[in-house]
Amino acid sequence: MKPSVDYISGESLYRPEVVRWRRRIEERYIPPEDAAVAVLLPCSATKPYSASPSHRRFIAAIKRGAKGKRSLVHEAIMTSPLALVPRELENLYPACCYDTTVTGHWSEEEKEVLAKAIRSYAAKFKGELLCYAGEAYAEVCESLGIDVIAKDNLLSEDSLKALEERIREALMDKQGTGYNPLEPLRKVADVQFGLGAGKALICEGARVRRGRIFYKGEQVAAISERHGYLALTLRGGELLRDFSGYVVELSFFPKSNNIFTPGIEHAGEDIRPGDEVIVVYGDEVVGVGKALLNGSELAKAERGLGVVLRHRRKAA
């Protein structure tokens, strides 16, 4: 069962997981390099967004317009307080499971937070940006010079036809590329562990079967049904060790799955409680699991449980 969280006040903009989401999208997320056009869409009450009736119709119109060039269209969802949710990250916490009050009115602070996120996205995106949304969404996009396809009656046949035609026009002289199912997972890894983690963990030739990721016949990670992030195996930890700030260094070889803080010599500063971490002893990855404290606390605390391992290397 997925966790749920309510964002019902202005203070929600500053909740730790919300600020962390916006920062990670700004610092760790790169839009698909081969996309020629991006459509900024409104959020929906149903999560993930793609399961909502409105987004199903948006997606259908985009597909009709793109035809065989669907991989050239990227989608991002505008929302408060998270600001921007790339479509391929909609199953990640907290985007996958939040509720917010829908009033149609946004504060100036909310608008500026969204505008900042869109500016950051636009600076990294090589193609054309379009907006298919009304109310505050359209106001923000217009202030940034983004073409707004429709503001009202977004589910009307006329509006959806306008979206379809605008996509077709944007892709008219573009060459389609094939869809790579590994790319969305690489984006997840980048956001979770840092830029570069996606290609390091999910190599060309990797395969995905029933939510598990394999490379050369060996499992490297699994996709969590609860929060959408990746749970590593020992092999996955080895692939990511040099590309991640989520490493915990021990002064001993662990003989149990419970790692107490006195035995921790160093921990990455980006680590927060609940994060997936790679545990090393010397030059060897000896475990992967969940941090219970942040990086500074893991390194400095003199007592208490710091990490719970999911996979542990057995002593030779």
Say what each PLM segment does.
Residues V19-R22, A51-G65, T103-S120, L160-L163:
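Well-ordered, non-membrane alpha-helical segments in soluble/globular domains
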Residues A45-S50, L82-P86, T101-E109, E135-E139:
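Short acidic, S/G/P-rich loop/turn micro-motifs used as interaction or catalytic elements
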Residues M1-I59:
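Active-site and ligand/interface coordination hotspots across diverse enzymes
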Residues K69-C96:
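Short connector loops at secondary-structure junctions
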Residues V220-A316:
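Beta-strand/loop-dominated core regions that host nucleotide or nucleotide-derived cofactor-binding catalytic loops
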Residues E164-S244:
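Anionic-ligand-binding alpha/beta catalytic cores of soluble enzymes and soluble regulatory domains
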Residues K111-N180:
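Glycine/proline-rich loop-helix segments at beta-alpha junctions forming the active-site rim
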Residues A95-E128, M172-C203:
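Extended, charge-rich low-complexity interaction segments
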